[in-house]
Amino acid sequence: MKIALLHFSFEDYTIELANALANYVDLTLIQPHKVAETCQDALDPRIQVCSFKKPRIRDPRNIFSMVEMMQIIRSVRPDVLHVQETNDFWYDLTLLFNTMPPLVTTIHDVFRHPGDQQTPPGAEFTRRISFYRSQQLIVHARSLQETLVKQFRVPPRRVNVIPHGELGSLYQRRASGTPPEREPHTLLFFGRIWAYKGLRYLLEAMPLITAQIPNAKLIIAGRGEELNQYFPNGHDEKHIELLNNFIPVNEVAGLFQRSAISVLPYIESSQSGVAALAYGLGTPVIASNLGGLREIVHHQQDGILVPPRDVQALADAIVKLLDDQVLQHQMRTSTLERCQNDLNWQKIAIQTLELYQKAILASKSTLGHWG
């Protein structure tokens, strides 16, 4: 089977999926030049790579970019085109006005997150084109499946739940130096710092935590919102370590390996690449009990779920886990077991192959030959 995998972003996810799929199909990865630089050293050599120029989103030269992209797709002549959600209205309009091969689209987020400043204007509406033009859709949580079926009236037979695979293995390969020692009282808040991530609730919980565990420390690693709003009078350097910038890829694994817990106090969630990364590095997760988080975190097995916006419950859960080394060890073991089961990329690739077959059959019955 010949597959074309197209992505504009979600590089980590795409790398791991592509490497797993390469064991089963003839795979061509299609991507913008600027994304290719991120992926080039991490891809299986069996994967053919095609790149195209992609200007900034408001640049009208995107018309020519989409023409080049379509020329690549037609030259590959794939049995299936699998697209990672693009958040790009130029692609969406190209999809609307062109005949495509059997199409599978992975939808990572049905709606834009609160505080999202990166999704281009208009993409919130044009992205719906892919909901209806795709023969099969992939989401990473049942809650997203339900949204597509109930709010967007996508037929249930076309919406499939496949877990978000673990990302720890990728970052272990990228890491430099010896893995650090696990710090039994260190917490990690990692990733984009946007309103929906709920950092304010974790910061409000910190005094409650340190009152019971004086040597507890929180690492805040990532960029996004201006952190001065959280620390108008400066931060407590004894208990908070700020890394308010882009974290180099060779340093990411070390942050999770240092930390006893990855904390995700989100107030809204579709799915979570951060949880998938934490589990791949053997770090338990304490997260809000909502959205896709309640599906990826197995409560009391590999993490703890707490009510969103509940500072006391969040503090209690963190203290409980920080104070129990045996429980930490049990949960670390469980996270790594998950990476050999539902979060394993080979298993995810096999599930994805089944959807490719479904997409081909659906396309034959409705669209006929393309190209």
Task: Go through each PLM region and give its residues.
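Membrane-proximal helix-turn-helix segments that form the acceptor-binding/catalytic region
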Residues: 67, 71, 120-137
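Acidic donor-binding loop of glycosyltransferase active sites
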Residues: 254-270, 283
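Conserved donor-binding/catalytic core segment of Leloir-type glycosyltransferases
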Residues: 179-197, 203-206
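Short His-centered aromatic/hydrophobic patch
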Residues: 10, 65, 83-90, 107
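Acidic anion/phosphate-binding donor-loop and adjacent secondary structure
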Residues: 116, 149-150, 157-158, 163-183, ...
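Conserved acidic donor-binding segment of nucleotide-sugar-dependent glycosyltransferases
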Residues: 299-300, 304-311, 320-326
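Short hydrophobic beta-strand element within catalytic cores of glycosyltransferases
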Residues: 284-287, 297
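Nucleotide-activated donor-binding/catalytic signature segment of Leloir-type glycosyltransferases, i.e.
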Residues: 229-253
